[in-house]
């Protein structure tokens, strides 16, 4: 469990996870199938909205993103690794060309508008 600077509860969420990898073009033939396996593992363990994105300004940067419903689900998700999961992660670390380990962003989502925003739910009134 990573150290947190926000005081969140186990049921806080949803939690968005983004992991940045630096992958050279010559390694894409191995990286992309590993990420397909990663997607399968994440979904098996309860992740939602899994995505893989490539940075348009720095194409060596690939970002894996997914969501889990709560903080406790994220913690549990990290403890569900099988031997095969660990081997896939180790191989990803070998392909990663960054000076440090892949950067992990753990974020809690917050609504900026109420679920019943007046802009979208105003009744139509005739001004004539």
Where are these regions (language model features)?
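An amphipathic, aromatic/His-enriched active-site/gating alpha helix that lines ligand/cofactor pockets
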Residues: 40-49, 67-104
